[in-house]
Structure formats: C-alpha cells, structure tokens
Amino acid sequence: MARIIETSTGLDALTFDDVLLQPGHSEVMPGQTNIATRIAQDIELNVPILSAAMDTVTESRLAIAMAQAGGMGVIHRNLTPVQQAEEVRQVKKFESGMVVNPVTIGPDATLAEALSLDEGPRHFRASPVVEKSHRLVGILTNRDVRFASDPEQKIYELMTRENLVTVKDGVQQHEAKRLLHTHRIEKXLVVDADSRFVGLITVKDIEKSQLNPHASKDAQGRLRAAAAISVGDDGYERAERLIDAGVDLLVVDTAHGHSQRVLDAVTRVKKLSNSVRIMAGNVATYDGTRALIDAGADAVKVGIGPGSICTTRIVAGVGVPQLAAIMSAVQAAQDQNIPIIADGGIKFSGDLAKAIAAGASAAMIGSLLAGTDESPGEVYLYQGRSFKAYRGMGSVGAMARGSADRYFQAEVRDTLKLVPEGIEGXVPYKGPVSGVLHQLAGGLKAAMGYVGGADLKDFQERATFVRISGAGLRESHAHDVTITPRKARIIPAQAADR
C-alpha cells in the first residue's frame, strides 16, 4: 500500500511558489556578484542557464546565442542523427579561436579540384596547401586562381609559397591580431613546431570574441554546444556522430531517468569518449540521483512534470514538486560534487534564484526562451499579438516527430494510440534571447544582493527559505493596479542623483 513519505522540505513537498528567500545582511551589490557556475567536470558557464532540448526551443541558432551570452544550448533530438550533428557543427564553427581542420588541398591537386571546393574562381577565397605529412607548403588565394585557365594545372605551380604569415600553435589572441593587422591579411596560418599545419586564425573570429567576452567556449576557443540523445542503439549511434561533430556535453534525455535502460545507456555512452561529459535525467528523488551518478553521469537533470507544457503529473499521477526534488537531488550529489540541473518550472527570474539557492548549479529553461527570435519557428499574429509555437516533447506532435522514445513509447506506430504527457500551444513573442537572459541573470544577481552572496556558492550557503501562504503569494505579485506599458526613457544623471 502506498504511504506518504517525508521529502527534503518535510511532509509537504514544496515548489517555487511555496517559498520566498529571506533577505539578510549584505555587503554585496548586485553588480558585484559573480554568477559563473560549473555544470560538469570541466565545463563552466558564465550564466547558469541552459536552453531546453525541445524542438520549439533549441537548434543551432539559439545554441549560438546562448553560448555567446555565457550559457549553453542543448540541441533537441527530433532530428536525424546527421541533421543533429550538423547543428552541433554550426555552433562549433560559428566563433572559433582557431578554425581546426579547415578545408585544405594538396600541392599535386589540379585547379579544377581546388575550384570544386568553392563556387568557381569568382567565389574562391583561400585554401592552405598541405602535403600528406601535414607540412604546410603554401596557400592558394583568389589572386592565384583568378586568371588561371587550365583546369589541369597543378596547385604547386599556382600557389603562393613565399612570405607566408604563420603563427605557432598556442599563440595569444592579441599577438595574432597584431600580425594580421601588420600584414593586412584576414587569415593567419597556424603551424606546430615541425611546420605542420594545425589550423587558421581569422579576423572575423577575433572580432566576434571581443563582442562576446563572457561567451562559453572550449579549450580551442569554440562556442560550447550540448545535444540530447535517447537510450538504446539509436542513442549510442547518435552519440558517436555528435562526438565526431565536436559536442561538449551529451544529455541522455528521458522522462524517467531512474530506469534501468537509462542507467545502462549512461554507462555505455560514457565509454565512448574521455573528453565529452554526460548529463542524464530526468529524476526527482535522492535514489534516482544516486543511481545516475553511480552509472557515470557527470551531471544530473532534475524535474518530473514541472514544465508549463508537461502533463505527466496529471496523466500519470507521478512527480515531485520542483523545489523538493532539487533539494533531494542536491543532498544525494553533494558528497561527490556532481552538479544538479533544475529542469522546468522556471516562470520568473525569482524562480531561477530559488532553484540556485536550493543547490542547483544551473537551470534548464524552455518556455521563457521559446518565443525569442532565435528559437525555431515563425512569428504569427493572433488577436493582434505576436506569438511563436511552443510544445512539450511529450505532446502528440513532438512524439510523432520522434520523441516518443523519451516516454518509452517508441514501439507505438499509430499516433492515435500514443499517450501524450504534454501539450501544444503558443507563447508571446519576446524578441532577441539576449534580452531574456539579461533579465533572468539580473533577477538572480538581485537575489544575491539581498541575501549577501558574492558568488553562487556563497549565495547557497547564506540562503534561507520562508514558507508563504496563498495570500503571501498573491501579495508577492503585482496587485490592485492596472499595469500599463510604458516606454523606457533615459534619466539624466543629475535627476537620478536627486
């Protein structure tokens, strides 16, 4: 017979709306706080936010914007393995400290072969000329091929080989920038100590990195990217392709992470690579968290049914209110220092602050990011307002497209026989994702200022919750007033001082 058990928040399992953070003595201003976090062994983010692996939230465009802002995007798996791997490649090559493994050509190749790399002589840009031993012998530029007419002419007869501007592998960005400026070129060739070609440093990538100083990047200066996989052979094969594409974090993404199939998948995928980290979920209990950690997970994703478009708790009657789930997972993971990711239920920046205060290293967010410019889908008008589509991965539409195995219904071929655990809907259009992330991060920093935490660890140690009533929740929101929109205006410094 079922029994009522006690959770980390007592007999009453609590969620974000049940509590508030208590203010305390503070010597910290919000602008002085540090919200950097670690979401896996060697993956740090400057903003503790990941975008959800949902087909109306995260593809390469949003993942790029997330990484540039200091967060991370998890590319959904309602794509073929080839398509998903290509989405990861788009992120990894968008902003590189160094372009690794660029297209090269051998000195014995022909002009025709070189032009086939691009769209003919008018569009040909440049290609390093590299021997089979990887030794750099020249560069073939647009000037070299512009007036060449013999398609069988060898590259070594056309290429530029004198006065090549090269830099050593590991060169500092400021030194590379100085060389590019001195020689008035847009690409510098990177070689190792034995003059073997390693990669390219470009002006565009240097400019991008200066525009986004807090971007999440790997050791090679490329934007960070994560991708979701399933369990079984499909998940394993997908993981192999994603690793080849350069993914930083694989997310074993299921509705019930405390399942033997998921535990086996984590253990199996973990053996594929020593450099790629594994996040697994979703769970909502102490035991579920421990099981995933024992299976080899580098981070654990927490949340059964808290999302705005998730109906698992209604359809199956299963779940744990999110705050209690986070605290239970943190308790299970703290002795091994495994990060906990709070997935779902974030409606306001204050909810993000509460999730972090409860011990989460970061939060995964879907609905707040779904209506942005960078999310998949088109903006449409409804009753005079702009919206974008948003649906749960447990909705009929998403399950029919490929996510049925997330809910262990992969064998169901007739969509009428699917048992959905999510809905399809729309969210208001929000503009660029950078604005949404700014508000979320700003709310978190404000909470840290109220509590007195200079960084996330300090914030978590100082934070205390107070339970509130329904009346307290109503009092917390704007009330007894009609909210009117007003355009922002800049207040002169003298007026602000008064």
From Swiss-Prot:
It holds the Pfam family CBS. One of its GO terms (molecular function) is IMP dehydrogenase activity. Its cofactor is K(+). K(+) binds at residues 305, 307, 310, 475-477. IMP binds at residues 308, 343-345, 366-367, 390-394, 421. It catalyses: IMP + NAD(+) + H2O = XMP + NADH + H(+). Its EC number is 1.1.1.205. NAD(+) binds at residues 253, 303-305. Residues 98-155, 159-216 form the CBS domain. Gene3D superfamilies: Aldolase class I. The active site is at 310 (thioimidate intermediate), 406 (proton acceptor). One of its GO terms (biological process) is GTP biosynthetic process. Pathway: Purine metabolism; XMP biosynthesis via de novo pathway; XMP from IMP: step 1/1. Keywords: CBS domain, GMP biosynthesis, Metal-binding, NAD, Oxidoreductase, Potassium, Purine biosynthesis, Repeat. Mycophenolic acid (MPA) is a non-competitive inhibitor that prevents formation of the closed enzyme conformation by binding to the same site as the amobile flap. In contrast, mizoribine monophosphate (MZP) is a competitive inhibitor that induces the closed conformation. MPA is a potent inhibitor of mammalian IMPDHs but a poor inhibitor of the bacterial enzymes. MZP is a more potent inhibitor of bacterial IMPDH. HAMAP family: IMPDH. Catalyzes the conversion of inosine 5'-phosphate (IMP) to xanthosine 5'-phosphate (XMP), the first committed and rate-limiting step in the de novo synthesis of guanine nucleotides, and therefore plays an important role in the regulation of cell growth. Homotetramer. Belongs to the IMPDH/GMPR family. This is Inosine-5'-monophosphate dehydrogenase. It comes from Rhizobium tropici.
